[in-house]
UniProtKB/Swiss-Prot annotation:
Residues covered by region (Disordered): 229-280, 431-465, 484-575, 730-758, 810-986, 1045-1109, 1125-1152
Residue spans of biased composition, Basic and acidic residues class: 730-745, 826-837, 846-856, 960-986, 1045-1106, 1127-1152
Organism: Homo sapiens
Comp. bias regions, Acidic residues: 269-279
Keyword line: Coiled coil
Gene that specifies this protein: KIAA2012
Compositionally biased region (Basic residues): 431-443, 509-518, 872-889
Disulfide feature: none
Stated name of the protein: Uncharacterized protein KIAA2012
Pfam assignment, any one: DUF4670
Length: 1180
C-alpha cells in the first residue's frame, strides 16, 4: 500500500530543458497502480432506511504533487468516470435517517491541511490493498459524467468576478482608455443574454478565454438536460422564487440536491434593465435536473459519505466555512446537523429575497443560500425525479465598488465644516435661484449637500470638478482671464476677486472675509489712470466688497452700481475713522472686523485696506479722511473723470454754470499761476512731476476739483471782503476739522488744490495760516460744494445762492478786513508756537534723502525772497529737519500775514507764492504715497489744480489794492492801525532775523562738530590701519616661524629615517654573514663526514680482506690440528671477536656523541642567525 504521492511511486528525472522534473514508472509501478484492488469497494447496505450504515474504506495518499507545485485535494488523473454501480441505477433513493454529524469541522486553511495529512489514520479494514480516492467503475462511459474538478482555475474566477460588473462597464473602461486591446471586447460576452452564454465543462482543460467566473462548481451536468436546466432557471426567476417545498413529495422523489436562489436586484441596478441578472449563471451554479442520474448515484454518494469522515460542512452549502479555493468566510456559524433544520433555515432565508445580505469582511463576496430555493410544483417534480447533485452556492451580488462614482463623505443634510473656494469664477446653472446674499457679497457659498443618487453623478469627472463638492446645482468652473477686472456676473452666477486679492473662507454657510494684503507695487503711466488689463492693480486702496443693504436703504436706491474697481496709483493715504466702527470691532483681534462700514445709502461695505493703515496714526495726528463706500473709478481714456451720476449731477451742473461765467479770467490766471509754479520748480531744482503731481481721489464726491476751484475765481475776486466775515466763524470749524473724525465714512473731504489733504497731513499749521482767511473761504466753499453725505446737493445750492448777494456787499465792507488783521496776527503767533510743538514729533518721521531735498528747497526759497549769499551758502549745508522746518513754517506764516499790510501786497504775494510753491514740492517729496517715481505725464493731469492757489492769491491781492485806491480818504483810525501793523511787522522781522542768526550759529556749531567728528573718524581710521598692519606683520612672522618649525621637524624625521635605514642594512649584513658562515661550517662538516665514511669504508674493506685471509689460514690450520687444539682455537677466536665487537661499539658511540654535539652547535647558530634576521625585519 502506497501512502505517498505520485512522485514517490516512480523515480524522477530532469527533462531536456533542465527545469522540469518528470516522473517515470516501471512496469511494477503500473501493475501496482492499476491493480483491481484499487477500486473503491462498496458494501451493500445493511438497512435501506439508514444511509449511515453504508461503509467503505478509503486510503488516500497524504500528499499530492503536481507539476505546478500546487497541493490539491482531488486529482483528476486518478479519477475514473461513472462512479455509480450498475446494479443500483433503477430508481432514486431517499434516506430517511438523520445525517451523521461528524466531529471534524474545517474553518481555516490550516485545518484543511491538517485534515489532509491526518486522513486515513483510523480505518476499519486494514487488510485490503490501497485504494485511491474516487476511482470509478466504468472508464469507457461518457466522459461528460466526470464528477471531480481537477483544481482551481484562476481564469474562471476572474471571469465570474468581471461578470458582476454592469453591462456597460467594459465600454466605459474602453472609453476611458484603460482597455486598449480590442480582443478583450470581442469575447467579453457582457452584453450577451445569459441564455445564450455557453456553459463550460469544468472537468476538462479550460479553453482559452479572457474573462473568467468567480467559482467553478464541483459537479456539472451536460448533455440533454442543458435546455431543461435553463428552462428551470428562468421559471425559478419568473415565479414566486421565495419558498422551498421540501415536503414528502420531495423526499419520495429523492430531492437530495441543492437549488440556488434566484438573483435579487440590488439598488444600484434597479434603474438599469440591461444590468439585471448578471451573475447567477456566470457563477456556473446550475440546477441538477438531469434524468440520466438515478438512485445508484445517490446511493453511491451516500455510501461514500457514510463512514468516510467527510463532514457535510465541507461540501458547498449556505453555511459553508470554506470555499473551493480553500479560503474561509469568517463569522459563519456552525452548520446544522439535522436536515429539517437546514430546510427551515433555507425557508427563512429565501422568504426574504429583497433583503440585502450584510457584507462579510472577507476577500470574496458573501455566499448566499445554496439549498432549495424555488417552488417545486408537483408537475415539476414529475419531470425532475432524478436526484440533483451538489453545486456551489451563488455569490450574492454587491454593487461594484471599482467603478462606483465618488460620493461625498459628508452626511446627507450636513454642510461641510470648512470649504476652501479657489478664486475662480463659478457659474451655477441652478434649478432653483441661489440666495441673493451670497451673490451680493461676491463670495458664493451655497450649502453643499452630497447627492446619494448616482444618476446625476458622473462616473468620470473632469479634473476641475471636485468630487467632494456635490451641490444641487451644476458647477461650471472658469479660471479668471482678466485679473484686474471683476465684473458682476448676472443672476445665477457670481464672481470672486482675483487670486492676488486674497481668499475667502466659508465656514459652514457663513462667509468670513479675511483681510486682503496688497503685494503689487506697479506703476501705471499715462494721462488716464486706468490700469492695463494684463497687470494686477497696485493695491494702494482695494475696492470695497459690497454687502447686503440694510432694510431702510433699499427703498429708493435706483442709482446704477458696478463692481468694476480700478485703483489709481496715486491714491492718498486713506484712513478709515475708528469712530465709525463699533466698539466691539475696534478692540477685536479678528482681522475681518473693521472692514464693514455703512454707506451713504445704508449699504454695508467691506473695505480692503492696505497693510495696517487702519490703526496707524496720521503724521499730523489729527487729519483723517473718510472713505465713501461706493468707490467707483470709471477711468477710461484721458478724461480722468471720477464721479457717479446719481450723486454728482447737481454739482456737475454747478460746475458748468461757474465755468461759463468767466472763461477769460480763468485762462489768464491759469497761465500765470502755471508760470509761477514752473519758476519755483526751476529754482528749487525739484522735478516738475513733484509739483504737478495731483491727488486723484477715489471718491465719487470729488469731481473736477481742479477746474472747479479755477472756475470759482471770479466769484472770489468780486466777493473778496464780502466773504471775510466768515473767517472768525470759519476758524473754529477749521480747527475742529483737524481734530475731527468723521462719524460717517461716506464722503472723502479734500481741501481743493493748495489746501489739499496732503498738505494738511504734512503742514497743518501752514495751511491754517496761509492767506489768513481767503484760502479758508475757498476751502470752506469747497467743503460746502463737495458736501458731506446725501444732503450735499441742498447745502451746495444754499452756498451757491448765498454767493451773489455777498458779491454786491463786498465793496461796502472794506473796514472789516483791516479790523480783523490784528486778531489774525495774534492768532498767527499762537499758531507758530503750536507749530513749534508739533514740529518735534514730525522730525523723526522724515528720512535722509527727503530732508536733503527739503534743505535745498528751503535755501532756494530764501534766495527767491532776497536772502544774503552767506545765508544761502549756509542753508545749502543744512541736513537736519527740525530747524529748517521751523523756519519755513514761520517764514510762510509771517509772509502770509504781510500781505495784509497794503503797499507790500504784491511783493509779499510773490514771496508767499514762491515759498509755497517750493514747499508744496517739499510736501510732495515727503508724502509717502506720492514719490517722484511717477512720471510727468501722470503728474500733469492736475497741473491746473496745483496752479490755482497762486491765481487766487494774485487775484485777491489785486482786489485789495483796488479797494484801497478807491478808498482814498481813510479815517485816522485806519492809518493808526496800519502804523501799528507796520511796527508789529518790524518786530516780527527782527525776531525772524534773530531766529535766522540763531540758526546760522547753530549750523556753524553743527558744522564744527561735524568737522571734529570727521577728524576723529580719520584718526580712528589711521589707528585702525596701523593696527591692521601690525596684526598682518605678526601673522606673517607666525607663519614664517611655523614653516621653519615644520622644516626642522621634517629634517629631523628624515635624519632619523636615514639612521634607521643604516641600522637595518648593518643588521641585514650581519645576518647575511652569519648565514654564510653557517653554510660554510655545514659544508665543512659534510665534507669531514664524507671523508670519515670513505676512510671507514676503506678500513672495513681491508678488515674484511684480512678476515678472509685469516679464515683461509684457519681452515688450513684446523685441518692440520688435532681435536683439542681445534677447540682451543675456536674459543680464542670467539673472545677476539667479542673484544673487537665491543671496541667497535664503543667507537660508534663516541662518533655519535660527537655528531650530536656538532648538530647542537649548528642549531644554536641557526637560531641566533634567525633571531638577527627577525630583528632586522622589525626595524622600520
Amino acid at each position: 500500500m502506497f501512502t505517498l504521492s505520485l512522485l514517490s511511486r516512480g523515480h524522477g528525472k530532469l527533462g531536456q530543458d533542465k527545469q522540469k522534473l518528470e516522473v517515470y514508472f516501471e512496469p511494477e509501478d503500473y501493475l501496482n497502480w492499476r491493480s483491481p484492488e484499487d477500486y473503491v469497494p462498496v458494501s451493500k447496505p445493511q438497512d435501506k432506511n439508514n444511509a449511515s450504515q453504508h461503509s467503505w474504506s478509503l486510503f488516500l495518499p497524504k500528499t499530492f504533487s503536481t507539476r505546478k507545485g500546487a497541493l490539491i485535494l482531488y486529482s483528476e488523473g486518478f479519477a475514473i468516470s461513472a462512479w455509480t454501480p450498475k446494479e443500483r441505477r433503477k430508481g432514486p433513493y431517499c434516506p430517511r435517517g438523520p445525517w451523521r454529524k461528524l466531529d471534524l469541522e474545517l474553518h481555516t486553511l490550516q485545518d484543511l491541511k491538517e485534515a489532509i495529512l491526518a486522513y486515513g489514520r483510523q480505518q476499519g479494514e486494514q487488510d485490503r490493498a490501497w485504494q485511491p480516492y474516487l476511482h470509478f467503475r466504468s472508464q469507457l462511459e461518457s466522459q461528460a459524467q466526470r464528477q471531480i474538478q481537477p483544481g482551481h482555475s484562476a481564469k474562471r474566477y476572474l471571469r465570474g468576478l468581471l461578470r458582476t460588473w454592469p453591462p456597460d462597464a467594459m465600454y466605459r473602461l474602453w472609453c476611458a482608455g484603460y482597455i486598449k486591446d480590442s480582443v478583450l471586447l470581442q469575447d467579453s460576452q457582457l452584453n450577451v443574454p445569459k441564455k445564450l452564454r455557453p456553459q463550460q465543462d469544468l472537468s476538462g482543460v479550460p479553453p482559452k478565454y479572457h474573462l473568467l467566473p468567480v467559482f467553478p462548481s464541483f459537479w456539472i451536468q451536460q448533455g440533454k438536460s442543458f435546455e431543461q436546466r435553463q428552462q428551470g432557471l428562468d421559471e425559478g426567476e419568473a415565479g414566486a422564487a421565495g419558498h422551498v417545498d421540501q415536503g414528502p413529495l420531495a423526499k419520495n422523489h429523492g430531492s437530495q440536491g441543492t437549488r440556488l436562489p434566484p438573483r435579487r436586484k440590488q439598488p444600484w441596478q434597479e434603474d438599469e434593465t440591461q444590468a439585471e441578472d448578471t451573475s447567477i449563471e456566470n457563477h456556473l451554479c446550475l440546477y441538477a435536473s438531469k434524468e440520466s442520474y438515478n438512485e445508484k448515484t445517490q446511493q453511491t454518494s451516500r455510501k461514500a459519505f457514510g463512514h468516510g469522515r467527510i463532514d457535510h460542512s465541507w461540501l458547498p452549502s449556505d453555511k459553508s466555512h470554506i470555499t473551493f479555493c480553500g479560503g474561509a468566510f469568517p463569522n459563519r456559524k456552525a452548520d446544522l446537523s439535522d436536515k429539517q433544520r437546514n430546510v427551515k433555515l433555507h425557508k427563512a432565508r429565501s422568504s426574504h429575497l429583497l433583503q440585502v445580505l450584510p457584507a462579510e469582511r472577507s476577500l470574496f463576496p458573501p455566499v448566499a443560500s445554496a439549498t432549495g430555493s424555488r417552488i417545486i410544483t408537483p408537475g415539476e417534480v414529475k419531470k425532475k425525479k432524478a436526484p440533483k447533485a451538489l453545486k456551489l452556492p451563488p455569490i450574492s451580488e454587491e454593487p461594484p465598488r471599482v467603478l462606483e462614482p465618488l460620493k461625498s463623505q459628508f452626511k446627507a443634510n450636513e454642510p461641510p465644516t470648512e470649504l476652501f473656494i479657489l478664486p475662480v469664477e463659478i457659474h451655477y446653472h441652478t434649478k432653483q435661484p441661489p440666495k441673493e446674499k451670497a451673490h451680493r457679497r461676491g463670495a458664493p457659498h451655497p450649502e453643499s449637500e452630497p447627492e446619494s443618487s448616482e444618476e446625476s453623478t458622473p462616473v468620470w469627472r473632469p479634473p476641475l470638478k471636485h468630487a467632494s463638492l456635490e451641490t444641487p446645482w451644476e458647477l461650471t468652473v472658469h479660471l479668471p482671464v482678466d485679473a484686474s477686472r471683476d465684473t458682476l456676473s448676472p443672476q445665477g452666477s457670481s464672481s470672486l476677486p482675483p487670486a492676488s486679492l486674497g481668499n475667502l473662507t466659508l465656514k459652514g454657510s457663513k462667509a468670513r472675509h479675511t483681510r486682503v494684503h496688497s503685494q503689487g507695487k506697479g506703476v501705471w503711466k499715462g494721462d488716464d489712470d486706468a490700469p492695463p488689463h494684463d497687470v494686477a492693480p497696485p493695491l494702494d486702496l482695494l475696492p470695497p466688497i459690497k454687502g447686503k443693504k440694510s432694510p431702510e436703504s433699499q427703498k429708493g436706491v435706483d442709482s446704477p452700481r458696478t463692481s468694476d474697481h480700478n485703483s489709481p496709483p496715486s491714491l492718498p493715504n486713506m484712513r478709515v475713522p475708528r469712530r465709525a466702527l463699533p466698539a466691539a470691532q475696534e478692540d477685536s483681534s479678528d482681522p475681518t472686523l473693521g472692514h464693514f462700514l455703512l454707506g451713504p445709502d445704508g449699504e454695508k461695505v467691506c473695505l480692503s485696506l492696505p497693510g495696517h493703515t487702519q490703526t496707524e496714526a496720521l503724521p499730523s495726528g489729527k487729519a483723517y479722511e473718510s472713505v465713501n463706500s461706493n468707490i467707483s473709478h470709471e477711468e477710461e481714456g484721458p478724461s480722468s473723470q471720477h464721479f457717479l451720476k446719481a450723486n454728482t449731477e447737481p454739482r456737475a451742473n454747478l460746475h458748468m454754470n461757474l465755468y461759463e461765467t468767466s472763461p477769460l479770467t480763468q485762462t489768464t490766471e491759469k497761465q500765470g499761476a502755471q508760470q509761477s509754479l514752473e519758476a519755483a520748480a526751476q529754482k528749487t531744482g525739484e522735478p516738475q512731476s513733484c509739483i504737478n503731481k495731483a491727488l486723484i481721489c477715489s471718491n465719487r464726491k470729488e469731481f473736477y476739483t481742479r477746474k472747479l476751484h479755477i472756475d470759482m475765481t471770479p466769484f472770489l475776486k468780486e466777493s473778496g471782503n464780502a466773504l471775510d466775515y466768515q473767517e472768525e466763524a470759519g476758524r473754529p470749524l477749521r480747527e475742529t476739522h483737524h481734530n475731527d473724525q468723521d462719524p460717517e465714512p461716506r464722503s472723502m473731504t479734500l481741501d481743493s488744490p493748495r489746501a489739499s489733504r496732503t498738505e494738511h497731513i504734512q503742514t497743518p499749521e501752514a495751511d491754517i495760516v496761509q492767506k489768513v482767511g481767503r484760502d479758508y473761504d475757498v476751502h470752506h466753499l469747497h467743503r460746502g460744494l463737495l458736501g458731506y453725505g446725501p444732503e450735499s446737493p441742498e447745502r451746495l445750492s444754499a452756498v451757491y445762492t448765498s454767493l451773489l448777494p455777498r458779491e454786491r456787499e463786498g465793496k461796502a465792507e472794506p473796514r472789516l478786513f483791516s479790523q480783523e488783521t490784528s486778531a489774525n496776527i495774534s492768532h498767527e503767533r499762537d499758531l507758530i508756537n503750536e507749530a513749534k510743538r508739533k514740529e518735534k514729533p514730525k522730525k523723526d518721521k522724515t528720512k535722509g534723502p527727503k530732508s536733503e531735498r527739503e534743505g535745498k528747497v528751503y535755501g532756494q526759497a530764501e534766495a527767491a525772497i532776497g536772502k544774503s549769499k552767506d545765508s544761502k551758502a549756509k542753508k545749502k549745508l543744512e541736513k537736519k529737519t527740525r530747524p529748517q522746518r521751523k523756519r519755513t513754517q514761520k517764514e510762510r506764516n509771517l509772509e502770509i500775514a504781510a500781505e495784509l499790510s497794503g503797499p507790500d501786497v504784491s511783493y509779499e504775494e510773490t514771496e508767499d507764492t514762491s515759498n509755497r510753491g517750493s514747499f508744496a514740492s517739499d510736501s510732495f517729496v515727503e508724502d509717502p504715497w506720492l514719490s517722484p517715481k511717477y512720471d510727468a505725464q501722470e503728474s500733469q493731469v492736475s497741473l491746473d489744480g496745483r496752479s490755482s492757489p497762486s491765481q487766487i492769491a494774485t487775484v485777491t491781492g489785486n482786489m485789495e489794492s483796488k479797494e484801497e485806491r478807491r478808498c482814498e480818504d481813510p479815517s485816522k483810525a485806519l492809518l493808526t492801525k496800519r502804523e501799528q501793523e507796520k511796527a508789529s511787522w518790524d518786530r516780527l522781522r527782527a525776531e525772524r532775523a534773530e531766529m535766522r542768526w540763531l540758526e546760522v550759529e547753530k549750523k556753524r556749531r553743527e558744522q564744527e562738530e561735524q568737522r571734529q567728528l570727521q577728524q576723529e573718524q580719520l584718526e580712528r581710521a589711521k589707528k585702525m590701519e596701523e593696527e591692521l598692519e601690525l596684526e598682518q606683520q605678526r601673522r606673517t612672522e607666525e607663519i614664517r616661524l611655523r614653516k621653519q618649525r615644520l622644516q626642522e621637524e621634517q629634517q629631523r624625521q628624515e635624519e632619523e629615517e636615514r639612521k634607521q635605514q643604516l641600522r637595518l642594512k648593518a643588521a641585514q649584513e650581519r645576518a647575511r654573514q652569519q648565514q654564510e658562515e653557517f653554510r660554510r661550517k655545514l659544508r665543512e662538516l659534510q665534507r669531514k663526514k664524507q671523508q670519515e665514511e670513505a676512510e671507514r669504508a676503506e678500513a672495513e674493506k681491508q678488515r674484511q680482506e684480512e678476515l678472509e685471509m685469516q679464515l683461509e689460514e684457519e681452515q688450513k690450520h684446523l685441518m692440520e690440528m688435532a681435536e683439542e687444539e681445534r677447540l682451543e682455537y675456536q674459543r680464542r677466536k670467539q673472545e677476539a671477536e667479542e673484544k673487537a665487537r665491543l671496541e667497535a661499539e664503543e667507537r660508534r658511540q663516541k662518533e655519535e656523541e660527537a655528531a650530536r654535539l656538532a648538530l647542537e652547535e649548528a642549531t644554536k647558530q641557526a637560531q641566533e642567525q634567525a633571531r638577527y634576521w627577525i630583528f632586522g625585519q622589525q626595524l622600520p
